Amino acid sequence: MEIIQKNLSTASYQTKAMLTGYLQTPVPKSPVQQFRPLIFVPGGSMTHIPVEQTEKTALSFSARGFQVFVLRYTFTSEHQPVYPNPLIDLALAVALLRKQAAAWHLKADQLTIMGFSAGGHVTALYNDYWHTKWLRRLSGVASDQLRPNAVILGYPVIDLNLGFPKDATTRAKWADDPARYNAAAHVNNLNAPTFMWTTFTDQVVPVQNTLSYSQALLAHQIPQELHVFAHGPHGMDIANALVAHHDDVDQPHVAHWVELACEWLDDLFK
C-alpha cells in the first residue's frame, strides 16, 4: 500500500485542504485490477478531524476492497463563514480522482462519497449541489467530472437549525445563509443514491437531521437505504473497539452498518 497526500489548491483557489489516499496495488493476474474509489469526509465540528478514528475507518474500507481517500477540508479557523469552501474542496477531490483514475486503478464510474457528522453535512450538500453552475465556476471543473455515483451518510448534520451547531455564534462561523445550506431543502432529481445511518439516542446531532434528508430524497424518488439504530452515542464511526473513544461506542449491532453499506453498494453497482 502507498499512502499519498495531495494539496487541493489551484491557480484560482488557495486552500489548506488535503486529500490523503490509501492506494492498494493490484495483485498481478488477479481478476481485481481496479478498485471502487471512496472519498471519506470525516466529522469534527468544522474545527478539526479526529485523526485516529478516521484512520481506522479508512483502513476498514480499504480491507473491503476500496481505494480510500480522506478529505481534510477547510476549517472555520481558516475561513469564516466556512461555506462554500468545503464544497469546493470536495469538488476538487472528486475531479482529481477522475483525472487519476487509470494511475490509481479506480473504477471511476463507481465513485462513492461518505461523510460523517459535519462531514456528512458537506457530503449531503455536495449531493445536492454538484451539478450547479456556481460550484462549476468556483471549482473550475466541468459538472460531468463532479458527479458522485453514490453517497453514504453517517449521523449527518443536515439542517443548521435542527440541533447542531448548538448556538448562533457557531452557526455564523459555518454559514451566512443557513437556508442555502439546509441540505434537505435542496435535494433534487440529480441527487445520487444514498445510504444513511444514525442512532435514535444521538444527543449531539438529533436523528431528525437524517430523517429530514430521507424525506426529501423520497419526495424526489431518489433511491435510498436508511438505518436508525436503537441506541448509541454520536461519533461512532465503525462502532467497534478500534474507535471506541468511550465505552458506549463499541456496539457490535451498530457496527453492522459497514457490511450493510458495502452490500448496498454491491447491489447498486452490479
Specify the residue positions occupied by each region the protein language model found.
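Primarily recognizes the serine-hydrolase "nucleophile elbow" in alpha/beta-hydrolase
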Residues: 92-170, 174, 178-179
